[in-house]
Amino acid sequence: MLVDLNVPWPQNSYADKVTSQAVNNLIKTLSTLHMLGYTHIAINFTVNHSEKFPNDVKLLNPIDIKRRFGELMDRTGLKLYSRITLIIDDPSKGQSLSKISQAFDIVAALPISEKGLTLSTTNLDIDLLTFQYGSRLPTFLKHKSICSCVNRGVKLEIVYGYALRDVQARRQFVSNVRSVIRSSRSRGIVIGSGAMSPLECRNILGVTSLIKNLGLPSDRCSKAMGDLASLVLLNGRLRNKSHKQTIVTGGGSGNGDDVVNDVQGIDDVQTIKVVKRSMDAEQLGHASKRHKP
């Protein structure tokens, strides 16, 4: 399983219109990632946290994966998911995430101020914490806040697409990635492409060699695009399609699919399926620390 949790959707607000040319470019990017070995990809819709969201839940997600990318999924076997990234500046102007999270598989936060970072690392019910790696970080990243965020299950995202753009973006990317690795102590990191065109796509070997030179061990680089990234998908899907992350509605076909891989069955068939969760050694260590008497 090779996962990319960040392929940008060509729309920055609900008021923008998506052109067929932009969708075709996105399909080419997804096809390129499939050729490079990726099996699970999340399409990322980035919007400001203070923007007015539609009242109708059906209008919250403009991506519409089944209609736009159903043929691509059937032809290639790709598993596509929807993700929303909320740009957080002033927490007082934000809206509740309960309605938003119902429409997307993954919810991420992108703080651009110190207050936004504090809110993202403490109170928000999110799956991912990411940054604008082509710009300066909103504040100095402290071990205490970032590690507490990782300990409650939120993963940190590194977007390598900024390393393939202009000189200023590359310079800032190197500085920001080192800060994220330092503050998180190399824990809870996932890697996404942020690819806006097929030319910005890289395979796992190219990404590993890049991020390893910035301080992340090579074994954690492979986990960042595999096990940990799939855990983000699992947590996000279980938020809406389970009861206490144990029993989910949908599926039930008996073909062995789970809540991550059963992209359409969970939404189409209203039956009951039991999902067994497993924890790796690192997660078990965190759990034992939190439950010490």
From Swiss-Prot:
Gene3D superfamilies attached to this UniProt entry: Metal-dependent hydrolases (3.20.20.140)
Compartment(s) where it occurs, according to its Swiss-Prot or TrEMBL record: Nucleus
A cellular component annotation (GO) from this entry: nucleus
Pfam families tied to this protein: RNase_P_p30 (PF01876)
Database matches in InterPro entries: Pol/histidinol_Pase-like, RNase_P_p30
Signal peptide: none
Main subcellular location of this protein, as a coarse class: nucleus
E.C. numbers: 3.1.26.5
Keyword Hydrolase: yes
Reactions this protein catalyses: Endonucleolytic cleavage of RNA, removing 5'-extranucleotides from tRNA precursor
Biological process, per Gene Ontology: intronic box C/D snoRNA processing; maturation of 5.8S rRNA; nuclear-transcribed mRNA catabolic process, RNase MRP-dependent; rRNA processing; tRNA 5'-leader removal; tRNA processing
Keywords annotated in UniProt: Hydrolase, Nucleus, rRNA processing, tRNA processing
GO molecular function: ribonuclease P activity; RNA binding
Annotated PANTHER family: RIBONUCLEASE P PROTEIN SUBUNIT P30, RIBONUCLEASE P SUBUNIT P30
Role: Component of ribonuclease P, a protein complex that generates mature tRNA molecules by cleaving their 5'-ends. Also a component of RNase MRP, which cleaves pre-rRNA sequences.
Membership in a protein family: Belongs to the eukaryotic/archaeal RNase P protein component 3 family.
Remarks, miscellaneous: Present with 6300 molecules/cell in log phase SD medium.
Quaternary data: Component of nuclear RNase P and RNase MRP complexes. RNase P consists of an RNA moiety and at least 9 protein subunits including POP1, POP3, POP4, POP5, POP6, POP7, POP8, RPP1 and RPR2. RNase MRP complex consists of an RNA moiety and at least 10 protein subunits including POP1, POP3, POP4, POP5, POP6, POP7, POP8, RMP1, RPP1 and SNM1, many of which are shared with the RNase P complex.
Protein name per Swiss-Prot or TrEMBL: Ribonuclease P/MRP protein subunit RPP1
Name of the gene this protein is made from: RPP1
